[in-house]
């Protein structure tokens, strides 16, 4: 351990976070949970019940491993200034800008997809809300409306400031979960074939693997959450991340199992669309989806802005971002994402490729590989034994290899879908 050099900041440079346990968990969970939860019952039609559940649990474990290694890297950096670029400074300094660009592109793409969902759903919901004017039946109207709603939220500097909108998003999600659970309990659905133990086919299983693998992506906000927490102890940070992952896992399992058992092989890519569209409760469910994705947009804008700033300024932390840079970059993200959403009605395949590369890179490859090399260069602030370090490094290497395999698999799956 004598060759290690702990990183520390001077007393005047110490950053004290203000975020508590609840707001940190809420923001991480809201970054994880999205409209993708509604496609899980359909994914189970390919995996079967048992393998679907096992895949959710394994994906949650792999995602938590990535978060754990992120927290281990953050513990070796000056408090409040942790980022992927800051870790890269001590491992692959020439690639720091590539890492930031990858995160920015991934978050930008997801943000655009949220706006496309708003534009697709609101014209369907508008007549039920008494908005029958032709203006309200155009997707462009609602995307522009979203711009006015999201602008003040996107300009907030701290992730912790978004805790209230994150709570609203999770309430909307819980309403969607309630709809699925209620119809499962009363048993008023038409069921297809249900596979309990055997997947439909090997290719069928692999074709829906991205739904599970990318279902727990929140690592782009992990450093921001860590930088803003009031209690910087490793135990507190890890428990915060574990709580977000386990809560999301339970919700995923609940919707996936009850939705699949309700419809079997008939389950569609959006489980809410399977219910009576004339029901006020289902219309409310569609509105809940809009609320969910709308308030998830700022959670993509925040890491996108930080990564763009770090890439432009060759900075290893967005902590020192000036008000001018903050305003200009935020405005550019808002204008470009909304413009792209107005121009394109479907980003399915583009996002599939961005997800295959970006999500895998951020969730598995970066945390695993950066921790593996960083832990050789910078001492842990704790008292890890040589054995503990060897085990951690083995898991980190395994996570990076797993991420690489998943990336190759998912890219091949997307290419196969294109050829069909």
From Swiss-Prot:
Keyword GTP-binding attributed: no
Protein's cellular compartments: Vacuole membrane
Residues in the Cytoplasmic compartment per record: 1-19, 71-96, 163-166, 217-240, 300-326, 371-394
Keyword Ligase: no
Cellular-component GO terms for this entry: fungal-type vacuole membrane
Transmembrane segments: 20-40, 50-70, 97-117, 142-162, 167-187, 196-216, 241-261, 279-299, 327-347, 350-370, 395-415
This protein's UniProt keywords: Amino-acid transport, Membrane, Sporulation, Transmembrane, Transmembrane helix, Transport, Vacuole
Record membrane topology: Multi-pass membrane protein
Predominant localisation class: membrane
GO molecular function list: L-arginine transmembrane transporter activity; L-glutamate transmembrane transporter activity; L-histidine transmembrane transporter activity; L-lysine transmembrane transporter activity; L-serine transmembrane transporter activity; L-tyrosine transmembrane transporter activity
Family recorded in the similarity comment: Belongs to the amino acid/polyamine transporter 2 family.
Function: Vacuolar amino acid transporter involved in the vacuolar uptake of histidine, glutamate, tyrosine, arginine, lysine, and serine. Required for sporulation.
Protein name: Vacuolar amino acid transporter 5
């Amino acid at each position: 351990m004598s060759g290690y050099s702990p990183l520390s900041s001077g007393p005047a440079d110490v950053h004290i976070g203000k975020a508590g346990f609840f707001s940190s968990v809420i923001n991480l969970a809201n970054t994880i949970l999205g409209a993708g939860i509604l496609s899980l019952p359909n994914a189970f039609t390919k995996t079967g019940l048992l393998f679907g559940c096992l895949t959710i649990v394994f994906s949650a474990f792999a995602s938590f491993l990535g978060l754990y290694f992120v927290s281990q890297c953050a513990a070796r950096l000056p408090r409040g200034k942790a980022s992927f670029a800051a870790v890269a400074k001590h491992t692959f300094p020439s690639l720091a800008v590539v890492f930031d660009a990858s995160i920015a592109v991934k978050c930008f793409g997801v943000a655009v997809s949220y706006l496309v969902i708003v534009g697709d759903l609101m014209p369907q919901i508008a007549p039920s809300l008494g908005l029958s004017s032709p203006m309200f039946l155009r997707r462009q109207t609602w995307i522009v409306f979203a711009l006015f709603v999201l602008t003040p939220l996107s300009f907030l500097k701290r992730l912790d400031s978004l805790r209230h909108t994150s709570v609203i998003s999770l309430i909307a999600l819980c309403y969607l979960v309630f709809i699925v659970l209620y119809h499962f309990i009363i048993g008023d659905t038409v069921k297809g074939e249900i596979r309990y133990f055997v997947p439909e086919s090997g290719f069928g299983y692999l074709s829906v693997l991205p739904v599970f693998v990318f279902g727990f992506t929140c690592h782009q906000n992990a450093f921001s959450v860590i930088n803003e927490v009031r209690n910087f102890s490793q135990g507190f940070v890890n428990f915060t991340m574990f709580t977000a992952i386990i809560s999301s896992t339970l919700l995923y399992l609940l919707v996936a199992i009850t939705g699949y058992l309700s419809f079997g092989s008939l389950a569609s890519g959006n489980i809410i669309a399977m219910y009576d569209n004339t029901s006020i409760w289902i219309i409310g469910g569609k509105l809940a989806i809009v609320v969910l994705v709308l308030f998830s947009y700022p959670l993509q804008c925040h890491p996108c802005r930080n990564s763009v700033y770090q890439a432009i300024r060759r900075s290893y932390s967005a902590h020192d971002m000036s008000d001018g840079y903050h305003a200009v970059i935020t405005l550019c993200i808002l204008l470009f994402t909304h413009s792209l959403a107005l121009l394109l009605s479907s980003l399915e395949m583009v996002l599939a490729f961005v997800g295959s590369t970006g999500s895998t890179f951020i969730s598995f490859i970066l945390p695993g590989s950066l921790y593996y090399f960083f832990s050789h260069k910078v001492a842990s602030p704790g008292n890890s034994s040589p054995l503990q370090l060897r085990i951690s490094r083995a898991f980190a290497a395994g996570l990076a290899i797993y991420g690489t395999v998943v990336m190759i698999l998912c890219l091949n799956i997307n290419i196969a879908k294109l050829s069909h």
